[in-house]
Amino acid sequence: MAEALASQLNNTTLGEASSDTRWKDQLKAPAKDARPQTEDVTATKGLEFEDFYIKRELMMGIFEAGFEKPSPIQEETIPVALTGRDILARAKNGTGKTAAFVIPTLERINPKSTKTQALILVPTRELALQTSHVCKTLGKHLGINVMVTTGGTGLMDDIIRLNDAVHILVGTPGRVLDLASKGVADLSECPTFVMDEADKLLSPEFTPVIEQLLSFHPKDRQVMLFSATFPLIVKSFKDKHMRNPYEINLMDELTLRGITQYYAFVEEKQKVHCLNTLFSKLQINQSIIFCNSTNRVELLAKKITELGYSCFYSHARMLQQHRNRVFHDFRNGVCRNLVCSDLLTRGIDIQAVNVVINFDFPKNAETYLHRIGRSGRFGHLGLAINLINWDDRFNLYKIEQELGTEIQPIPQNIDKKLYVYESPETIPRPIANASQAQLATSGNQTQNMGERRHNNHSNGGHYQFGRGRGSYRGGRSQGQRRNMQNEMNKFGTSQNQQQSGKSQPAQVSPN
């Protein structure tokens, strides 16, 4: 009898083991990313996701999303987070921080409960949308409901959605506090409280809101803070609201190793000419171009379109639905260049971006770090080019000193191996149709002077090239159109140059 029972148990175990070896083969995983990676994500302990003993349904979502092995921040965070301990984690942008807190959060969710069990706070609407997308993608086999709520959208819509079970709530602090204060979002049994980009969330403008939100959570909550930089205000919050947090610091150096940084000394009125030269010489897959004001964002987007290049723009003064559409289309490869303010400096992950250009140089090291971190995502290669005028020289030196990095003068020819991959097929692109894919991979990936793309963006954030001029197609949220003539004069492009779409290339090497 005992032998028969043992034989039956052995047969069952063998069957389960056989099943264990087959479930991965049935997954619809994306094509493997063949691009080389830097030590930012490869210097691991050799762990596998299976070593964390998480649910198979969660592992299915992880592998189907294209994850292969945990990155260093994920190796350090996930096992500790699964125990419920508070975590204070500091790691570089683009090294897998989002998945580091999303995976343990998903693992601890009970789908049978109708209560909200996790709150994830982020500082911007775009980052909220991206984070909720990660939650839904990794947790798609778990049967859980993820909701994103931000300012700028209808409050009544959020109230209606909260009538259903919401297991994970992702949002910006102000909107979540509004819902919690009205008793619509019930956080009384929400044990997980996560803050991404914690340094921004704990700035003076957000801190009172964060502390009010904590009061709606149970006292035995788990608090997890993630960021690339931790100022003194984070230490103050830790001492006040966290219990013996496990501290992770993977910031032996601040900048990503895969990003090559250059500067070019350029007079203000020559910046557009210099940008034109860069476009004609660089092999750009997608680029993000930063300006220091919303006014200059729109002006530059218009100038780029007049020069004949595809271009979207985004800034904080646009309607939220317009910003969402621009972000979605750019991420899907509809357009090659995006001009924006610092709205998109934090956490935004678009892996097809291989070039970042600071058309306006930032004033501090923190902003610079977040800007250039939009390229070189997850250990890959990227290029950061800074257009510097005479007034920026002290900020350049200060940022180099604070970050412990070297920003080199731009050479006449930039080695493509620093930011270009041998085959465009190695670049992951979430493109929905063939026409978009053709835009992404046509030719040799280089923008040419004669390239004129008519991106008829219906919701603003776009300039259409026509009749030799960029025509305005919406994108502003309020107020009358501002008189931009003074700023246009600063850019130094003549009327004839605007109509022809051509300008003389600037000398981008330093004097």
Swiss-Prot record:
Chief subcellular location: cytoplasm
Chain positions recorded as ATP binding sites: 91-98
Domain Helicase C-terminal: 258-418
EC supergroup of this enzyme: hydrolase
Any one Gene Ontology BP term: regulation of translation
SMART domains: DEXDc, HELICc
Short motif DEAD box, span: 196-199
Any one GO molecular function term: ATP binding
Any single Pfam family the record assigns to this protein: DEAD
Biased composition (Gly residues): 467-477
Compositionally biased intervals (Polar residues): 7-18, 436-449, 483-511
Positions with biased composition (Basic and acidic residues): 19-38
One GO cellular component term noted in the UniProt record for this chain: P-body
E.C. no: 3.6.4.13
Range of residues in the leader sequence: none
UniProt similarity note: Belongs to the DEAD box helicase family. DDX6/DHH1 subfamily.
Purpose: ATP-dependent RNA helicase involved in mRNA turnover, and more specifically in mRNA decapping by activating the decapping enzyme DCP1. Is involved in G1/S DNA-damage checkpoint recovery, probably through the regulation of the translational status of a subset of mRNAs. May also have a role in translation and mRNA nuclear export.
Domain characteristics, as noted in the entry: The Q motif is unique to and characteristic of the DEAD box family of RNA helicases and controls ATP binding and hydrolysis.
Protein name, as recorded: ATP-dependent RNA helicase dhh1
Highest classification ranks of the organism: Eukaryota, Fungi, Dikarya, Ascomycota, Pezizomycotina
